Amino acid sequence: MKTRLTLILVLLIYIGAASHTHAQQKKVIKTMMIAGQDGSHYWQGACEAMKQILENSGMFKVDFAFTPDFGGDIATFKPDFHQYDLIVINYGGATWTEPVRKNFEKYVADGGGVVVIHSSVVPMADWKEYNEIIGMGAWDGRNEKDGPYLYWKDGQYVYDYSPGYAGYHGLQHETVIEHRAPHHPILQGLPPQWKHFKDEIYTRLRGPVRNMEILATAYERGRHEPLMWTVSYGKGRIFVDLLGHCGNDPYSMRCTGFQVTLLRGCEWAATGAVTQEVPADFPLKDTYTLRPEFKAPFHAYPKTKH
């Protein structure tokens, strides 16, 4: 009788542990996506595309936090950052109010995850801590007073303190992305070079460039310009991705490379680790691949049991 009770007890403990492990594996990353007031981009389409990319992975649940339209009262924008594991910024408008700025700074410093997409490096140049959080930015009056240009040359960072404005882009085009920190969790196992579909490539960014690690660059206008990087701010992890232009259509976001690095960057920013497999459809140096439905095809993860 005692042996039988012991076996039952062991079985119950095993079932409980297995259920707990399963629950941990299924934990969804609560994500707030901030957007609005960007007259140069179809931010609504970009938000919907990224929401699909994130939620189709099964790892994220995305809520939108939109600011008022241009001319509206920015004081009505009062997001509760601390309810979320991750904040994705897809924003290009007015500087947030001081209480919101302070709450955001605390959220990040306390360990919150942040992902900054494309033109979100442009606004709020007058907010010192935002510049620290994003590492470097473009336009919006930025120049040598805000910090140096940063680019990659001969395996090293180059800090260029020469005077000049921040920010430039030419016509949209395909480009080859080169990884500069291949052992970082976001890039671990991915091809070191891959072709990205047509996009608007930002160059000549400048800023405080503190606590930054360049992840990837592209060769533009005679030098290797950073396109992806991370920043540490207090206990917080920030992933900045300059890819993802959305004019009338989010076609750049259909690129498999964009989607995979976005997913991996979001997971890393939220948790400090990346658990995702390297997909079979990831692009190579000479060939881009697309996921037009903003989700992985069935064959992309052959090791995963469906």
What kind of feature is each model-predicted range?
Residues 1-5:
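Positively charged n-region of N-terminal signal peptides that target proteins for export
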Residues 6-17:
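Bacterial N-terminal signal peptides
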Residues 19-23:
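Boundary at the C-terminal end of the N-terminal hydrophobic targeting segment
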Residues 24-26, 30-34, 38-124:
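Helical hinge/lid and interdomain linker segments adjacent to catalytic or ligand-binding clefts
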Residues 25-29, 56, 79, 211, ...:
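Extracellular ligand-binding/catalytic regions of CAZymes and related secreted enzymes
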Residues 34, 94-185:
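A glycine-rich, often tryptophan-bearing local segment used as a flexible ligand/cofactor-contacting loop or short
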Residues 37-40, 118, 164, 172-174, ...:
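Active-site rim elements
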Residues 55, 61, 153-237, 301:
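Catalytic beta-strand/loop cores that center a nucleophilic Ser/Cys/Thr
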